[in-house]
Amino acid sequence: MDTGVIEGGLNVTLTIRLLMHGKEVGSIIGKKGESVKKMREESGARINISEGNCPERIITLAGPTNAIFKAFAMIIDKLEEDISSSMTNSTAASRPPVTLRLVVPASQCGSLIGKGGCKIKEIRESTGAQVQVAGDMLPNSTERAITIAGIPQSIIECVKQICVVMLESPPKGVTIPYRPKPSSSPVIFAGGQDRYSTGSDSASFPHTTPSMCLNPDLEGPPLEAYTIQGQYAIPQPDLTKLHQLAMQQSHFPMTHGNTGFSGIESSSPEVKGYWAGLDASAQTTSHELTIPNDLIGCIIGRQGAKINEIRQMSGAQIKIANPVEGSTDRQVTITGSAASISLAQYLINVRLSSETGGMGSS
């Protein structure tokens, strides 16, 4: 696949997420939202912006490829305009490049970098853009930031090439999306980072289309398509089962006995081995989460029943640190394969979202 496929469309739907500072986002939104409204109307893309009480915010672009890149070009042009305005009274000798950050699943970064860095070198040389892939995942997520800098056309071409790589190499395991931490709430939910921008209280989860985004702002019938972000690359039967577990958990609280998320015996072979085998041969790693003290109980459950269910279903080891005096949070360490860790994170987030009403019931 080459960038001609991206440019030609072929009914491929993309979802691109940009991580921006509040000032940049304010410029894109414009006075009374006029700027972003114009971008939506002229591009035909869905443009959603995460809640405003964070130092950083996520801008999500979704739609057919031609609409996505029209909107993307308009955003780049706006950033370029802002640089020009800032240079008017500046004494700086050189003009800074346009710089932005993409947010992508960490499991796809290897394909983007390539063996010995050959792929990312090729992208740099062919587009003229500077590209840097962050070594660490963004907090409470399985995603990394990719920083791109250059002139507008170089950045646009660079992002197109990145999209091609992402489409050819879908993410592995469950993607936990990065959500900038609001100043008023430390909880990270699995339902996507833009839920508050529409005022909706309900979360949208994938049903039978494996390429749908876990993003409540992008509701409605999906196109037959690939998506780049939020895609689940686990087999469809596994995805359907995970969805059923999550949905039934939101409607029927977990019991205090051995019944699990879906009312199935959590000690049964169906649950105990099903998810644990997703990536059983993979290298063992660890990931840390921070959960507020007042919500840790819903993760542990009575006599540890709920945390044990999550351990059995994911195959991961989960350790919850003892309370620290003066701290409002508890440290949770998850150890296992990448797939086990991702699934454990997902199930923990389901519990948090259900407890706080974030998943709702319909």
Curated annotation (Swiss-Prot):
Xref: InterPro entries: KH_dom, KH_dom_type_1, KH_dom_type_1_sf
Phenotype reported upon loss of the gene: Embryos undergo normal development until midgestation (12.5 to 13.5 dpc), at which time they undergo a dramatic loss in viability associated with combined cardiovascular and hematopoietic abnormalities. Conditional deletion in the erythroid lineage is not lethal and does not lead to defects in the hematopoietic pathway. Mice lacking Pcbp1 and Pcbp2 in the erythroid lineage die at midgestation; lethality is caused by impaired erythroid development and loss of blood formation.
Pfam families attached to this UniProt entry: KH_1 (PF00013)
Keyword Ubl conjugation carried by entry: yes
Record-linked PROSITE patterns: KH_TYPE_1
Modified-residue entries (Phosphoserine), positions: S169, S185, S268, S361, S362
Gene Ontology terms describing biological process: defense response to virus; innate immune response; negative regulation of defense response to virus; positive regulation of transcription by RNA polymerase II; proteasome-mediated ubiquitin-dependent protein catabolic process; protein maturation
Alphabetical UniProt keywords: Antiviral defense, Cytoplasm, DNA-binding, Immunity, Innate immunity, Isopeptide bond, Nucleus, Phosphoprotein, Repeat, Ribonucleoprotein, RNA-binding, Ubl conjugation
Main location: nucleus
Subcellular location: Nucleus; Cytoplasm
Molecular function in Gene Ontology: C-rich single-stranded DNA binding; DNA binding; iron chaperone activity; RNA binding; single-stranded DNA binding
Domain KH: 13-75, 97-162, 284-348
Domain notes: The KH domains mediates poly(C) binding.
Reported function: Single-stranded nucleic acid binding protein that binds preferentially to oligo dC. Major cellular poly(rC)-binding protein. Also binds poly(rU). Acts as a negative regulator of antiviral signaling. Negatively regulates cellular antiviral responses mediated by MAVS signaling. It acts as an adapter between MAVS and the E3 ubiquitin ligase ITCH, therefore triggering MAVS ubiquitination and degradation. Negativeley regulates the cGAS-STING pathway via interaction with CGAS, preventing the formation of liquid-like droplets in which CGAS is activated.
Subunit relationships: Identified in a mRNP complex, at least composed of DHX9, DDX3X, ELAVL1, HNRNPU, IGF2BP1, ILF3, PABPC1, PCBP2, PTBP2, STAU1, STAU2, SYNCRIP and YBX1. Interacts with IFIH1 and RNF135. Interacts with MAVS (via C-terminus) and ITCH (via WW domains). Interacts with CGAS; preventing the formation of liquid-like droplets in which CGAS is activated.
Protein name, per record: Poly(rC)-binding protein 2
Organism, as annotated: Mus musculus
